[in-house]
């Protein structure tokens, strides 16, 4: 039973409309960050009555995407008369699920601390997730390749080799994203351990590590400030490749770039303000060898 008749899951006509809006609107929305300095999350979060607790807010703004995609994958094929989907569709849906199992569920659990998230930031993230998952999920469930010959045509000369290569690139990006996140987590774990030793020796309370920062130096952090962002781009580029360079996967990849690039740019300014130009200038921001 559809949750919203004609829209969730969408008819083909409505899916095409959503996909067009998704491609055109989010680059504009993401680019607003070049002129709006406020960002109520993470390093730049501030006290507000409209803040959500960090872990809860993160889960609530990340989980709608994978929930929507799985719902569409389980309902739309039957509505359009598809008995079974090719293995490629299931693999791509699985990759999406793996990513968000980490980002939506595991990530907030294993973070040593999380700053509050303003409800406006969370709301915009929910909108991103819903539009993206509706576009991708509908494509994988019914409106993209749904037979072996259609997949042969979509992948073209690259064939299965392109699909496998795309998956490999995806997993390289996923691993890079996780391990660079882990390096950021270790900064706060180390600070907490240091404080616990001091507290035990001097019988004082442990101070919160919510706002404890330093410039990380491990792995790609030696050369750039936001390798975890870059690795996420690598992930979704691989996904786009494996999908046969599909429009929904391209829109996801490009919209990630439009949203995250200005965030990295403002993040560099924050690092300079906190630690000085001398410690930051030798590092790229987000694209090695370019910016």
What annotation goes with each model-predicted range?
Residues 1-127:
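Membrane-helix and juxtamembrane interface regions of eukaryotic multi-pass membrane proteins
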Residues 1-34, 69-72, 85, 121, ...:
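Hydrophobic transmembrane alpha-helices
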Residues 67-71, 129-147, 232-239:
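Hydrophobic alpha-helical transmembrane segments in multi-pass integral membrane proteins
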Residues 95-96, 124-136, 165-176:
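Alpha-helical transmembrane segments of multi-pass integral membrane proteins
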Residues 107-137, 144-149, 190-196, 212:
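Functional transmembrane or membrane-interface alpha-helices that line membrane-embedded catalytic
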């Amino acid at each position: 039973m559809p949750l919203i008749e004609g829209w969730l899951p969408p008819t083909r006509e409505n899916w095409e409309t959503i996909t067009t809006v998704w491609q055109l609107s989010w680059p504009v929305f993401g680019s607003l960050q070049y002129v709006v300095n406020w960002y109520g999350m993470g390093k730049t979060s501030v006290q507000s009555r409209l803040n959500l607790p960090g872990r809860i807010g993160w889960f609530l703004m990340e989980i709608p995407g994978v929930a929507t995609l799985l719902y569409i994958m389980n309902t739309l094929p039957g509505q359009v008369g598809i008995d079974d989907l090719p293995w490629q569709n299931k693999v791509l849906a699985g990759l999406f699920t793996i990513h968000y199992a980490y980002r939506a569920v595991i990530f907030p659990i294993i973070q040593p601390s999380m700053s509050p998230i303003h409800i406006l930031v969370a709301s915009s993230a929910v909108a991103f997730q819903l539009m993206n998952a509706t576009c991708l999920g509908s494509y994988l469930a019914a409106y993209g390749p749904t037979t072996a010959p259609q997949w042969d045509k979509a992948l073209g000369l690259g064939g299965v080799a392109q699909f496998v290569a795309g998956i490999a690139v995806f997993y390289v990006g996923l691993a890079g994203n996780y391990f660079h996140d882990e390096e950021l987590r270790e900064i706060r774990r180390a600070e907490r351990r240091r404080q616990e030793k001091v507290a035990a020796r001097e019988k004082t309370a442990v101070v919160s590590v919510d706002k404890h920062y330093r410039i990380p130096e491990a792995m790609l952090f030696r050369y750039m400030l936001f390798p975890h962002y870059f690795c996420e781009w690598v992930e979704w580029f691989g996904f786009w490749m494996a999908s046969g360079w599909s429009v929904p996967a391209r829109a996801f990849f490009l919209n990630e770039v439009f949203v995250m690039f200005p965030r990295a740019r403002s993040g560099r300014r924050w690092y300079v303000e906190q630690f000085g130009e001398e410690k930051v200038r030798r590092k790229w921001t987000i694209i090695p060898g370019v910016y």
